Amino acid sequence: MDVIVFHHALGLTPGVQAFADRLGAAGHRVMVPDLYQGETFDSIEAGVAHAEATGFDTIIDRGVAAAAALDDRFVTIGFSLGVLPAQNLAQTHSKAVGAVLCHAAIPLGTFADTWPGGVALQMHNAPDDSWGDFEEAEALVEAVPGAELFVYDTSAHLVTEPSLPDHHPAIADQILERTLTLLASVS
């Protein structure tokens, strides 16, 4: 299965690349576009400031442009900020067959009024994560038949990012395993 992974506000960190590499080791063809064009940040706040200065529409456009290189059906994966292009593609691209949205959610209606039939949705979020848009995740899962919401007992945001104190290896491993399950189900 082709997979396109979109990084969080820190940029294309070694942690994001390592997650993608683990998907590749499981036999998937993985693309990890750099939406920040080489820049990385040490804090969420600095990364968000960069994203705001760049423009969220520009970040989405870069993600959509990267997906043009995919020749086959694909699954999008987005971590926090990366949910913007991931969800956009899942809702609007004819070759998207699934989305894994981690640590964020965008309201239905932002990119399209409905979730397309036949596009699987898996979400990973924590109610106590102040950056995580948990209520939006619940609303999206409620609106999409067959969607899954995995809830984690933490207030940390980027639990999958090893370079941060928020990193939670056990949760990161659960997210990876559940992602692999979704990929197997749509392959």
Feature-to-residue mapping (PLM):
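Short beta-strand/loop motif that positions the catalytic acidic residue
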Residues: 123-125
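Alpha/beta-hydrolase fold nucleophile elbow
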Residues: 70-79
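Serine-hydrolase catalytic machinery in alpha/beta-hydrolase-like enzymes
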Residues: 1-71, 159
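Short alpha-helix in the alpha/beta-hydrolase fold that links the catalytic acid
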Residues: 19, 132-142
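Gly/Ala-rich beta-loop-alpha elbow adjacent to hydrolase catalytic centers
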Residues: 78-82, 86
